Amino acid sequence: MKYQFNVAMACDGCKNAIDRVLTRLGVEDKSISVEKQEVIVTTDKPYELVEQTIKKTGKEVRSGKVLE
């Protein structure tokens, strides 16, 4: 499954924090853009689990959707 999230990020530190938690979750295929405030992941993990994992960084997940 491929998911897209709109996440409030201010800097590369925010990006790195999200990258770390997603890597720990086992998500290898990911794109994180501070400029677009966007996180796109391709994984077999459930949507809710990925969303909650991103929220654990303290960042606001403004919206999200399943792309495919």
From Swiss-Prot:
Keywords: Chaperone, Copper, Copper transport, Cytoplasm, Ion transport, Metal-binding, Nucleus, Transport. GO terms for molecular function: copper chaperone activity; metal ion binding. Cu cation binds at C11, C14. The keyword Metal-binding applies. GO terms for cellular component: cytosol; nucleus. Belongs to the ATX1 family. Shuttles copper to the transport ATPase ccc2. Protects against oxygen toxicity. PANTHER family: COPPER TRANSPORT PROTEIN ATOX1. This is Metal homeostasis factor atx1. The lineage of its organism: Eukaryota, Fungi, Dikarya, Ascomycota, Taphrinomycotina.
